């Protein structure tokens, strides 16, 4: 199955490269990436241009939900994967997604947040810890940034 990876970005220049590197270094190769710039004013689009992906640029900021929906309109895959620009997937994540959707009883899959901090400076670690604690306690350990829906 082909996976359409939809990544909305808004001034994501600090995290987008790492997100895209993780996707393109995946051991699963049957995918397309659609990056939707939600009227970013930083160099997010220039970063995305370094990868083999489709880039949509919205004329005004309308939020990540609108951007995701625009990405869905361009998707050609059998599986939709909504990935936030600050999410770094594991090398085998796309393979696991594909394998799970081969079971026709599966309609949706949701990712789980990892506690391993991506960035090592003290301020960022504090912010990640604080955010993680509240997101996890409110969502009962579910992480919504990486969510897939079978078309």
Show which residues each predicted segment covers.
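Acidic metal-phosphate-binding loop of nucleotide-sugar-dependent transferases
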Residues: 62, 87-88
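Catalytic metal- and UDP-sugar-binding loop of GT-A-like glycosyltransferases, i.e.
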Residues: 58, 83-85
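Conserved donor NDP-sugar-binding/catalytic core segment of glycosyltransferases
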Residues: 88, 92-123
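Short, acidic, metal-binding catalytic loop of nucleotide-sugar glycosyltransferases
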Residues: 21-30
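A conserved acidic beta->alpha catalytic loop
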Residues: 14, 22, 37-45, 87
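Short, flexible, basic/aromatic active-site loop/helix in glycosyltransferases
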Residues: 111-115, 123-144, 149
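Short aromatic/hydrophobic "clamp" motif used to bind/position activated sugar donors
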Residues: 80
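Glycine-rich, basic loop-to-helix element that forms the pyrophosphate-binding segment
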Residues: 58-75
């Amino acid at each position: 199955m082909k996976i359409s990876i939809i990544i909305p970005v808004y001034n994501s220049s600090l995290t987008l490269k790492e997100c895209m590197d993780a996707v393109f270094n995946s051991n699963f190769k049957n995918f397309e990436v659609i990056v939707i710039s939600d009227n970013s004013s930083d160099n997010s689009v220039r970063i995305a241009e370094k990868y083999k992906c489709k880039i949509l640029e919205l004329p005004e900021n309308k939020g990540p939900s609108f951007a995701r929906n625009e990405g869905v309109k361009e998707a050609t895959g059998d599986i939709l994967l909504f990935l936030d620009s600050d999410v770094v997937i594991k090398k085998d994540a796309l393979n696991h997604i594909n394998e799970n959707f081969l079971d026709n009883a599966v309609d949706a899959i949701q990712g789980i947040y990892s506690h391993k901090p991506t960035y090592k400076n003290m301020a960022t670690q504090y912010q990640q810890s604080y955010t993680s604690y509240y997101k996890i306690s409110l969502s009962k350990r579910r992480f919504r940034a990486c969510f897939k829906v079978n078309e």
